[in-house]
């Protein structure tokens, strides 16, 4: 839960904000209607707050004193204003507020909440600023720091590559076109040969007046482009939109590859990843182990205790499976059927399956339900096509069920 300080006196604006907060269970607003109230609140409880939404003009703070108050406590500050003043906006942004939002429409207030959500995520976001100009790097850092990003700097192409190697988890690169040693184009081409589009966001920047430069940057693999000089809001909007787009693509990819109930790979993703493991085994002349697992008497669990209990059994089993086989390829192929693929030997896998079986017997998944058990078929052999390997494991799974369930058949 994140506590948000809201300093606002307008009944209409408060009504809108209260409505939006009701849709955000992770955000808890604490309202103050005046500068005096806010001073008391921050003086006694400033450590409770994650960020603040602040009206620029209050009856007892007509000149933005409420913003200055919040900034003194180093809280991320989103400013609301009923009128637009470009000079005032620039002053506030250079002072370090998160953003300056006009009270224009529902969309404006929703944008303020997007900022709150990004602030909550941004502490995990790493951004590399690559520019040979000290002044330009400091300017970009000053713009981005109020949003709680982790900022790293590089002054030339060589240092940029070094920072990328030292920080493989970098999320975004702000890259100047004209740097000593290697151009922005060359760096983008080099990085895209190693990294997929969703692994690193690249925003090119340049003071070059050529109109084709932005298109060339994007054709080389950049995600976006900014022409210098740019205003703080433009950079922040580009950074936020590219990060949100990446998050959406990752969520779509996860939904396409992972089973929504258990969190394991689905059949398609299991096959795709399995083919890569097979190719590795073929290159290294290694054998491969594959197992098919099936929950015992699953239909009886569904019929006798309800489908919610059946779902609970699947989730509990999937968690246990992931815990006992953390470095192996796992998947839910459908219903109560699971699969496992690894380069480990059959004895290693068989021993782990027996430990998993003992562990599952003590797991609780529904009141009054029988102990959780599973049957497994395990095959170890040459890395032929995946379908044949799974078929061999499935034959052994069938034998395990014929022999009374709750066992693994290998031979």
Which residue stretches match the model-derived regions?
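Short regulatory alpha-helical coupling segments
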Residues: 253-254, 267-287, 318-325
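Acidic catalytic/metal-coordinating carboxylates
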Residues: 34, 61-65, 156, 183-187
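Catalytic/regulatory signature loops of cyclic-dinucleotide turnover enzymes
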Residues: 392-411
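Conserved nucleotide-binding and Mg2+-coordinating catalytic segments in signaling enzymes
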Residues: 253-272, 293-307, 315
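Active-site residues of response regulator receiver
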Residues: 53-55, 175-176, 206
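A short pre-motif secondary-structure segment
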Residues: 329-332
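Catalytic strand-loop-helix junctions within cyclic-nucleotide turnover domains
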Residues: 341-349, 374-392, 396
